[in-house]
UniProtKB/Swiss-Prot annotation:
It catalyses: a purine D-ribonucleoside + phosphate = a purine nucleobase + alpha-D-ribose 1-phosphate; adenosine + phosphate = alpha-D-ribose 1-phosphate + adenine; cytidine + phosphate = cytosine + alpha-D-ribose 1-phosphate; guanosine + phosphate = alpha-D-ribose 1-phosphate + guanine. The keyword Transferase applies. Keywords: Glycosyltransferase, Transferase. GO terms for cellular component: cytosol. One of its GO terms (molecular function) is uridine phosphorylase activity. Coiled coil: none annotated. Catalyzes the phosphorolysis of diverse nucleosides, yielding D-ribose 1-phosphate and the respective free bases. Can use uridine, adenosine, guanosine, cytidine, thymidine, inosine and xanthosine as substrates. Also catalyzes the reverse reactions. This is Pyrimidine/purine nucleoside phosphorylase.
Amino acid sequence: MSKFENVSVIKKANVYFDGKVSSRTVLLGSGEAKTLGFMQPGEFVFDTNQKECMELLAGQWDILLPGESEWKTFNAGESFNVDANVSFKVKVSDFADYCCSYTD
């Protein structure tokens, strides 16, 4: 889905890692929340509170999922899922434009 309709957007940005990662929360009419974000170059560790689907819209990133020992490269159009209450690592060499969907 390249477009969300009939949504509310929380204006205040979620800013992490000294401004190298930022996102905005989008609330769909169904009550579902998503974040649209952007990452600058760096290595980051994220903790999840609920299941997430991370979709890369543009750019590239390397992901180290929980329990894995090898990084996996993702390109634009690819996604991965992460369970609730885990940590995962992200390495960005150029930039990453992403959409995070939260699921139960």
